[in-house]
């Protein structure tokens, strides 16, 4: 590529449409369509991803079989534990019946005392609750006023945060509108990457001519997009 062509590529690199580049690839014979005359032994990324997914599914299936075997062993162990627990429950049942009889005797002897203590406790509790209610009514206006102040402060803080977020969003939109221009080195690195990918397998003169044709089309696309971008910027300055 000449310096002038690379200059156009560097100036309009971000404005190149992916669909235009795809058309250039297909016209140059690199597309895998029905009329394609060039084939490579390289696997596509989609095929590699599918193979990896199949391997992961096989590994997951083996892991599930191992989990099922472990579950069967746990069930057998659980059955043995249940038998032991049933025997323990029967022994505990005999002890519980004796304890229940002793508790019934103690409850019957203490029913009279509990009735008197309960009546006295109700009287004492009523007096204390009555004093607390009067004190709370006296403090209610102050409490409600403080709650109102806290609500107003929290509302004002939320409004300030919303305003700050709106300003940040506007700044981000303005930054997105600006298209960064790559350097000369970045443009050369891109074309070197494309060439390395296309020439990764043995090629003949016919394939080499296709690569040169592809580079010519890419330069043409970048020139067209550069002119389009320059015209849009000119209209923006006039407005």
UniProtKB/Swiss-Prot annotation:
Keywords: ADP-ribosylation, Centromere, Chromosome, DNA-binding, Methylation, Nucleus, Phosphoprotein. GO terms for molecular function: chromatin binding; DNA binding. Residues 28-185 are annotated as: Disordered. Poly-ADP-ribosylated by PARP1. Signal peptide: none annotated. Residues 46-117, 148-179 have a biased composition (Acidic residues). Coiled coil: none annotated. The modification Phosphothreonine is found at residues 37, 39. InterPro entries: CenpB_C, Dimerisation_CENP-B_sf. It is found in: Nucleus; Chromosome, Centromere. Its main location: nucleus. GO terms for cellular component: chromosome, centromeric region; nucleus. Residues 176-239 are annotated as: Homodimerization. Interacts with centromeric heterochromatin in chromosomes and binds to a specific 17 bp subset of alphoid satellite DNA, called the CENP-B box. May organize arrays of centromere satellite DNA into a higher-order structure which then directs centromere formation and kinetochore assembly in mammalian chromosomes. Antiparallel homodimer. Interacts with CENPT. Identified in a centromere complex containing histones H2A, H2B and H4, and at least CENPA, CENPB, CENPC, CENPT, CENPN, HJURP, SUPT16H, SSRP1 and RSF1. This is Major centromere autoantigen B. It comes from Ovis aries (Sheep).
């Amino acid at each position: 590529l000449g310096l002038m062509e690379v200059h156009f590529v560097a100036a309009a690199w971000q404005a190149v449409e992916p669909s235009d580049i795809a058309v250039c690839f297909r016209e140059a014979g690199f597309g895998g369509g029905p009329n394609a005359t060039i084939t490579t032994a390289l696997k596509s990324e989609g095929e590699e991803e599918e193979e990896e997914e199949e391997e992961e599914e096989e590994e997951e299936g083996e892991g599930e079989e191992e989990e099922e075997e472990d579950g069967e062993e746990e069930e057998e162990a659980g059955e043995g534990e249940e038998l032991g627990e049933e025997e323990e429950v029967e022994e505990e049942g005999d002890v519980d019946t004796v304890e229940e009889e002793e508790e019934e005797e103690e409850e019957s002897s203490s029913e009279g005392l509990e009735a008197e203590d309960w009546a006295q406790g109700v009287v004492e509790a009523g007096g204390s609750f009555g004093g607390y209610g009067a004190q709370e009514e006296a403090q209610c206006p102050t409490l409600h006023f403080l709650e109102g102040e806290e609500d107003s402060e929290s509302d004002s803080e939320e409004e300030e945060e919303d305003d700050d977020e709106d300003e940040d969003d506007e700044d981000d939109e303005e930054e997105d509108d600006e298209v960064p221009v790559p350097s000369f080195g970045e443009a050369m690195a891109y074309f070197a990457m494309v060439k390395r990918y296309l020439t990764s397998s043995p090629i003949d003169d016919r394939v080499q001519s296709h690569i040169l044709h592809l580079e010519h089309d890419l330069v043409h696309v970048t020139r067209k997009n550069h002119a389009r971008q320059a015209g849009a910027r000119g209209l923006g300055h006039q407005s």
